[in-house]
Amino acid sequence: MRRLYIALVCTQALHSAEEIAFGFYRRTPEIGARIQTIIPSFPILSMSATVFILLNIALVAILAASLPFVYRGTKYSRVMVRALGIAEFYNGAAHMTMAVVAGGYFPGAASAVVLFVLSVFVLRSTLRPEPNGVPRS
C-alpha cells in the first residue's frame, strides 16, 4: 500500500505538470460549455494560469507532506490513502471523459489513464489485510 501511494503521489505530480504544460485551465470552459448542452446546470469553470498553477503546487506539496505519515503507518494513513485513491479514480475518469467529449487529446488525459489504473490498485490495497491478520497501515 505504501509504495502504491508513493507512486500515486508521483503520478499526480506528473499529471499536474501535464495539465499546466498543455493548458488545462484554458480548455475547461470549452468542455464545460459542451457538457452544459447535455446537463444545463453544469457549471462552467475558469481560472487564471497563476491560480491554477498555485493550486497544483499546493496539492502536490500537501501530498508530498503526507508521504512520511503514510510510510510510517500512522493511525489515519489508511484513510489518507483511501481518500487519495478515490479522488484520483474520479480525476482519471473525468479527464478520460473530457478527452472523449473534446473528440481527442485533452490536457491531463495521458497521465489520467495511469492515475485511474493506479488508483484502482491503491484502493484494492487498502482492503487487503496483512498475512498475519493485522490490517495494513
Can you describe what each PLM-predicted range is?
Residues 1-5, 76-84, 135:
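Membrane-interfacial loop-to-transmembrane alpha-helix junctions, especially the N-terminal start
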Residues 5-12, 60, 81-88, 92, ...:
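Residues within membrane-spanning alpha-helices of integral membrane proteins
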Residues 10-31:
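Transmembrane alpha-helix/helix-exit interface in multi-pass inner-membrane proteins
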Residues 29-44:
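Perimembrane loop-to-helix junctions flanking transmembrane segments
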Residues 40-60, 108:
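A loop-to-helix transmembrane entry motif
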Residues 61-78:
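Juxtamembrane helix-break-helix junctions at the cytosolic face
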Residues 74-85, 90-109, 128:
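Membrane-helix boundary connector in multi-pass membrane proteins
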Residues 116-137:
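Membrane-water interface at the C-terminal end of transmembrane alpha helices
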